[in-house]
Amino acid sequence: MCIRDSARVERTRSRPIPAGQVSVPQALAFLVLQALIGLAVLLQFNRFAVVTGIASLIIVAVYPFMKRVTWWPQVVLGLAFSWGALMGFAVILGGIDLTALVLYVGSIAWVIGYDTIYAHQDAEDDALIGIKSTARLFGAATHRALVVFYGLAVILLSLIHI
């Protein structure tokens, strides 16, 4: 629903909110509905899992603004997208152990890699409007950065036999 930037990027300006097909109040209503359904599911789990799930909302809430603050918004995306690894352990084991943390960090590295690739399609528009990303940060050296992030992901995931 942060449409200011979406309306200024070629790839995203035709999305429903920037294109005017869905209003911000309609999107907020849908968000509230989804949040209530998610909360109903979350409350079925143990207390530790509920707290872990609620904690994820901080990262989810700040992510859309990170591209204005840091060259590393893909890290914050990785923290958010990979949170499910922590949730799985929280639900099943009632806690988070070293295996969960290794899975989490390995998944974050994987997300940084694929979202860096994805961000390259918007790099020109992003530069014009001041949006930061690892794609812009790495530029021509992206392939070397991807070797590092995907290499780290493979190493970490292999340590836990995934």
Regions found by a protein language model. Give the residues of each.
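Short, small-residue-biased leader/transition segments that mark boundaries at the very start
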Residues: M1-I3, I162
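Cysteine-centered, disulfide-bonded loop motifs in secreted/extracellular proteins
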Residues: R4-S6, W83
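Multi-pass membrane catalytic core of lipid/isoprenoid biosynthesis enzymes
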Residues: A7-G53, L128-I160
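Intramembrane alpha-helical segments
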Residues: R15-V102
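Single, functionally critical "micro-switch" positions that shape active/binding sites
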Residues: V22, W72, Y114, Q121, ...
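Membrane-embedded alpha-helices of multi-pass transport/permease systems
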Residues: F48, I112-E124, L128-I131
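Alpha-helical transmembrane segments of multi-pass membrane proteins
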Residues: V60-P64, G106-Y114, Y118
